Structure formats: C-alpha cells, structure tokens
Swiss-Prot record:
Pfam families according to UniProt: Anticodon_1 (PF08264), tRNA-synt_1 (PF00133)
NCBIfam families linked: PRK13208.1 (NF009687)
Record key words, sorted: Aminoacyl-tRNA synthetase, ATP-binding, Cytoplasm, Ligase, Nucleotide-binding, Protein biosynthesis
Signal sequence bounds: none
InterPro entries assigned to the protein according to its UniProt record, in alphabetical order: aa-tRNA-synth_Ia, Anticodon_Ia_Val, M/V/L/I-tRNA-synth_anticd-bd, Rossmann-like_a/b/a_fold, tRNAsynth_Ia_anticodon-bd, Val/Leu/Ile-tRNA-synth_edit, Valyl-tRNA_ligase
Any one GO biological process: valyl-tRNA aminoacylation
The protein's name in its UniProt record: Valine--tRNA ligase
GO molecular function annotations of the record: aminoacyl-tRNA deacylase activity; ATP binding; valine-tRNA ligase activity
Enzyme Commission number(s): 6.1.1.9
Domain of life: Archaea
Domain notes: ValRS has two distinct active sites: one for aminoacylation and one for editing. The misactivated threonine is translocated from the active site to the editing site.
Main function: Catalyzes the attachment of valine to tRNA(Val). As ValRS can inadvertently accommodate and process structurally similar amino acids such as threonine, to avoid such errors, it has a 'posttransfer' editing activity that hydrolyzes mischarged Thr-tRNA(Val) in a tRNA-dependent manner.
The keyword Aminoacyl-tRNA synthetase belongs to this UniProt entry's keyword annotation: yes
Source organism per UniProt: Nanoarchaeum equitans (strain Kin4-M)
Length: 751
C-alpha cells in the first residue's frame, strides 16, 4: 500500500507506551514546562522535538531516560488574558472565583498543547504529567520557601524596587526588557543661590522634579568647576539642593549636569545611598504622581504638564526629540517605575560567586552560552524580590499574630492558602492574619528538576540522593538563561548544596522564512497543527533534525519540509521492495553486500558519537544521504538482479542494512520506523539500542565511494549518447573496482 502518514502515526499513538529505556545509567531531562497559550507557534513546539531526539538517542546508548511532560501555569500571563479578553480586571471579582476562572482557561489550553505534543510523536511520560499550579507542586514550592525561611535566606524589607504600574506588582530584574522609545529631552534652568547664574540640566523625566535632591557634574568638567558644592534652586518647588562633583555624571550627555531624583532610575538610587540623601516618594502604586502640580496624573501625563508649567516659569531653555532605551515589563511592556515597597527577598548576592563556580562544572552546549549566564550573574546588584501582589500563583505560606507578633510558616508539606485559611496563634491563642501576597512564578519554575527528582525516585523505587547522582540535563532557549536557568541553579544549590545539571543544551528560535521572529503582530505565526496535518510528524521531525544546529536560530521552510516528505516515501518504498523477499541468513557475503554492511556499521558507529555530542543534525544528514544516495540509488540498483534470483547474500544485506537504518531513523521519525520494523522484523525498534561495531574496513568504504563515482559516470555517459540506462555499453571497469565486477556488469549491461 502507498505511504499514508496519518494512518501510520495514528497507529503509533494508539500503540504508544512510555519506555524508560534499559541500562544502569539514568538521564533526567528537565523538560521545560511551557506556559499554556491559546496559540502555540511551530518553533516553540519543535523545541520539544529536539528534546525528544535527546531522549530517544540516549535510550539507544543504554540509558534509562526520564522525559516528563509538564506545564507551567502560575503568574501574570493568565491574569493579563482575563483582563484583556474576558474583561475581568484584577480585583474586580471574588478571589476564589478569579482563581477558578484562571484554572479553567489554563486547563483548556493545556489539553490542546498536550495533543500537539502527542501528535509530534514525542516519547514523553504522558502518564505522569505535572502542572506547576497543581496543589501537589505548589505544596513543594511552599515547603522550599519554609526551608529557606528557616535558614534565614528569605527576609522582608522595604527597598526601592522595580514596579509595574499596570500589573500593580513588584518584579525582578530578570523580568525586565529594554525598549527604544521616542521621548523629549528637556533642558531646565536651575538658579544658583545668591547669584544671577543658572545651571542647565537636561532630563527626560521633568515630572520627577519634585523628587530632585541634588545635581551632579563630572569633577573634571571645566564648565562646572565654579559651581562645585554650590546650591541650586529647584524650579517651581524652590527647594535648595547641592551641586556635587561626581564621576557618574556624563559630560557628553545633555549639558553634562544631571539632576538626581529619588527613584528616577537605579543610578539615582545608588547615588542617593552613597550621598545619604533623603528620598521622597512621589509615585504611588497605581503609577500616579502624588505632588502638585502633577498630582493624580500618570507619569506620561505629568511629564507634559510639568513641561507646560516650567515653560510658564521661563526656565525651559530648549526641548529635543530623542530616542532612548527604557525598561519595560516583559509581560505587558509597561514602562517600569522604581518605588519603595515592603516585599520579601531571597538572598542571592552572597551566592553569586558560588553559582558562577558551580556553573563551571556544567557542560554547556554550545559552550558560548556559558558567558550569557556569567554576564547575568555579574550584573546582579540586589537580592531577588520574590513576593507579588497578585492572585494566580503559589501563596506565601505565612500567618501573622496581630497581638504578640508571632509569624507562623507552614512546614507540613501541604498546600496552603493563608488568605482564606484560619489559623490560631500557638503562643497567645489569637486569631492570626494570613498573608495575601503570592510568590514570583520563577519560585515555582526554578524547582522543576527538584520536583522531578522527588517524583521519579518514588516511581522508579530509587532514593532521591541516588537519582540525583545520575545525569541531569536542562534543554531550554537562550532567552531564559537569566531567569529559568539562573534561578534553578540558585534554588537547587540553596536547597541541596548541589549543581542542578550536568548538561545545559540551548536551542535556537524558530523564525519565519524571511528570518523574522514569529509574532501575531507580523501575522507570520505558523501553528503546529497546520504542518502536522499537511506533512505528518515523521516528515516534520526529520526536516527539523536536518535543519537545526543546537544554539542557532533556524527558518521554517515549507519547501524543504515537502522535500523530506519525498524521503519518507523513499523509505516506505524501500521497505515494500525488501518485503517481497524472504529473509535468509548467510556467512558468505559478496563484495558489494560486504561494502554496504560495512558502510551502515560505520554510520552506526558515528551515530553513537553524534548523539553523545548532541549533533543530531549531522546524524540526520548523513542518514539521509546514506538511505537515498547510497543504499537506494546505488546498492539496491546494483543488486536487483541478484535479489530477484534469490541470492542469499544480497537479501541478507538488504534486511541487515535496513534494520540498522530503521533503528537510527526511529530517533527522528518514530512512526514510520516503528511500523516498518514491526512489519519486516517483528521488533519494537524503539527498544533496540545502537551497536558499536568496532573497526570497519576503511579500504572498502573508499572503494565504495569510487563505485558510486563510476556508476554516476556510466549513467551520465549513456544519457549523453542518447542511450537508455538498460542499453548495453562497452566500457572498461577500473581495476580497483574489480571486486564489484559481477554487479557492475549486470547493472550497466557492460559488453
């Protein structure tokens, strides 16, 4: 029958059962739990195919492989969806009902994504799926909070913090992106006290003038040496502030004189601390200004208002239109403000050097991404703010006694919701007040490997320590090195004293055919279902295997995918051809058969090396060339007449070689490989390991390449002479190909 990918892949899914693999070594893949979404683009989905290549490849090498299915779910994204599409703003309905709606939507998206993962023919453990917003998982997050609280690594303090006015919550540095935006650079004149002179300051934040407590100039800037330690008067507010020489001032920006406002940016915060200036909070938690003449306005509105006020005062020297980089919240792209808030922090500054040292014990693939992690660690200047003023996330497991001040932390390993659970103070018997804040979603996501160790130690009957002492691997995108990877290394080290991973494999990003990132804004998002329906998983996976180079972005090219569909048909047709012959054993191999068997052994030896080095694209490309250009186009053509005459050697070689091909092919295209292996060999090819064959005959491989060259030459010669390929030809067989003489005469009809 003709190749029908839908039927084959449906058969595969119906017969699928998770297989850990066989061997003493264990590889634990910390599968990235994707955040559920209504639209999942093909690049994101295909990253899981790469993880599947790793899982299948290492099973072939004799590892037991833990390859779990998991989904994220905590945090702001679902809350933003509720606000934008369900028209349910945060805080507009009962908290319990709000949480229920979030969960219902997430679960519906998860089912859709689960189907895609299965349609991709992943060898995942679908039976033991986890969600980071399940009570079981959240209970572990809370337990780790309690452990670190007891160790003194978590504390509450009021510090200036990155704050998103839209999401109304604190966020960590790792959640910030930089965007280039147009703005106004306003040149404002400050009068020098007891003088007719003015010093002009250029600023993009005139709305913060009420929080200005100093002006700095560079010590070596000759223009301002006469003003060192003089007093300037803040326009409108008539506040006296010092002019201070400071190396943080950039003489080349604006006028070289810089106004220092409490919470203008992190440089301002640093200088305030250094100079021991008293800060003033003029932005509230709604992102609105709190002092006149801009009271009640957003910072953007206040900016325009203050410019008008300053113009009326005659202190605006000029205004320039510029572009500059501003920090925005990665989730909603709202510009970040810095405001002082009381939040919980996890200590990370004392661990920076330890995590860097630990990371040197991890193998990065590709190696260059190690630097991304190190650069991020070097850039950290504050502890990690881990509390959020939202609802759909893991609750902070604390209760407070309003009478005696006792703080209770839940350490029982159960999931708690303090905002609705009653607790009586064990010291004074007073009703306690439950914490209403939740944890940063990365507090959950950063313990996936920790959770998996605990979960699978029970499933496999291995103690946690023993399982952790095996091999752990983290596959992930480069864009979350600073978040998921760093936070996991930090958290696991704080909890266990161990490195979280032996290997970190960084995948690139799937782009459209023009090299652009897929985005709804560009209208270039390709959904996995579209390509799976059109080409099938085996084809799509094999194209991806050939295309991807680990750590590099790649382009989705349908023309190339369609080309791989032809390859699948070629594999199918080879199987049909072989199936017409009855398998037979023989020890008496003819040279051509010995050559092709030698070749496939050589390829299988290389396959083992490629898998160990995570070079799946090289294996896929070499297997493709072998099947199409060598096995089908040359070997099968050379031996057709012998096989037709039931030659033992030819038929044995056909069966032997194709079984080895299917074994390697099953890493990339498991549906067709499993189906054909079952039909031809009555074997479950997924459970078959790769075999290392030792030394192979390189002289025979060399002669094989010359054999291919000779075949191509003869076919081209016949075509140029207007002959059919079956027509006779008079040509001398090269001496080095004498061992193949019998098959060459039959193939080319050499007279």
């Amino acid at each position: 029958m003709p190749y029908n990918p839908k039927e084959i892949e449906q058969w595969y899914k119906e017969n699928y059962k998770y297989f850990f693999g066989e061997g003493d070594k264990i590889l634990i893949i910390d599968t990235p739990p994707p955040y559920p979404a209504p639209l999942w683009h093909i690049g994101a989905a295909l990253s899981y195919a790469l993880q599947d290549f790793i899982a299948r490849g290492f099973r072939k090498l004799g590892y037991k492989v833990i390859f779990p299915e998991g989904f994220d779910g905590n945090g702001i994204p679902i809350e933003m969806y509720l606000e934008k599409y369900e028209k349910i703003p945060f805080g507009s309905i009962d908290r319990e009902e709000y949480i229920k709606k979030c969960r219902q939507i997430l679960d519906s998206w998860r089912e859709k994504m689960d189907k895609i993962l299965k349609d991709l023919l992943l060898s995942m453990d679908f039976e033991h799926r986890y969600n980071t917003d399940d009570p079981e998982y959240r209970a572990l997050t809370q337990k780790t909070f309690a452990e670190l609280w007891e160790k003194g690594l978590i504390y509450e303090a009021e510090y200036p913090i990155n704050y998103c006015p839209h999401c109304k919550t604190a966020i960590a540095d790792a959640e910030i992106e930089r965007k280039i935006k147009k703005t106004k650079l306003v040149y404002i004149k400050f009068k020098i006290k007891d003088s007719d002179d003015y010093i002009t300051v250029a600023t993009t934040r005139p709305e913060l003038l009420g929080a200005c407590k100093a002006i700095i100039v560079h010590p070596d800037d000759e223009r301002y040496k006469k003003y060192h330690n003089k007093i300037a008067i803040v326009p409108y507010y008539n506040r006296e502030i010092p002019i201070i020489p400071h190396k943080m001032a950039d003489p080349n920006f604006g006028t070289g004189a810089v106004m220092i406002c409490s919470y203008g940016d992190w440089v301002d915060v640093q200088i305030f601390r250094e100079l021991q200036l008293k800060p003033e909070k003029i932005i509230d938690e709604n992102g609105r200004l709190t002092i006149e003449p801009v009271k009640g306005l957003t910072t953007k509105e206040g900016r325009e208002k203050m410019i008008e006020v300053l113009k009326q005062l005659g202190v605006v020297e000029k205004i320039e239109e510029i572009e500059h980089s501003v920090p925005v919240h990665e989730r909603c792209e709202t510009e970040i403000e810095i405001i002082p808030m009381k939040e919980f922090y996890l200590k990370q500054l004392p661990f920076k050097e330890e995590i860097k040292k630990l990371s040197k014990e991890i193998e990065f693939i590709p190696e260059r991404y190690r630097k991304n992690l190190e650069n991020w660690i070097d850039s950290i200047t504050i502890d990690w703010p881990i509390s959020r003023r939202r609802w759909y996330a893991t609750e902070i497991p604390l209760w407070y006694c309003p009478k005696c001040g006792y703080i209770h932390v839940a350490k029982d390993g159960k999931y708690h919701q303090p905002w609705k659970e009653e607790m009586v103070c064990p010291r004074c018997n007073t009703k306690m007040v439950g914490e209403t804040r939740v944890l940063d979603t990365w507090m959950d996501s950063s313990i996936t490997i920790y959770y998996l160790i605990k979960k699978y130690s029970k499933i496999l009957g291995i103690d946690e320590e023993g399982l952790f002492n095996n091999y752990t691997l983290r596959p992930q995108g480069y864009e979350i090195i600073r978040t998921w990877l760093y936070y996991t290394l930090l958290r696991v080290y704080q909890l266990t004293g161990k490195k979280a991973f032996d290997f970190v494999v960084i995948n690139g990003m799937g782009l459209d055919k023009h090299g652009r990132k897929m985005s709804k804004r560009y209208g270039n998002v390709i959904e996995p279902e579209t390509l799976l329906e059109k080409y099938g998983a085996d084809t799509l996976r094999y194209w991806f295997a050939m295309e991807i180079s680990i750590g590099e972005d790649y382009r989705i090219n349908e023309q190339k995918i369609a080309g791989i569909m032809k390859f699948m048909n070629k594999v199918w047709n080879i199987a049909n051809y072989i199936s017409q012959y009855q398998y037979r054993e023989t020890q008496n191999l003819k040279p051509t058969d010995e050559w092709i068997i030698n070749y496939v052994k050589y390829l299988e030896n290389k396959a083992i090396e490629y898998i160990r080095n995570f070079e799946f694209n090289k294996l896929a490309r070499e297997l493709y060339r072998f099947v199409w250009d060598v096995f089908a186009n040359h070997y099968i053509e050379l031996t057709k007449k012998r096989a037709k005459n039931n030659d033992d050697s030819a038929i044995y070689a056909l069966y032997f070689v194709f079984e080895r091909v299917l074994n390697m092919l099953s890493i990339f295209s498991p549906g067709i490989a499993k189906y054909l292996a079952k039909k031809l060999y009555n074997k479950d090819i997924e459970k078959e390991k790769l075999k290392y064959w030792g030394k192979v005959r390189l002289d025979l491989l060399y002669k094989g390449e010359k054999l291919i060259e000779f075949n191509n030459y003869v076919w081209k010669l016949k075509t140029s002479q207007g002959k059919k390929l079956k027509d006779p030809i008079s040509i001398e067989i090269p001496k080095e190909l004498e061992i193949f003489k019998e098959d060459l005469i039959l193939l080319h009809n050499i007279q």
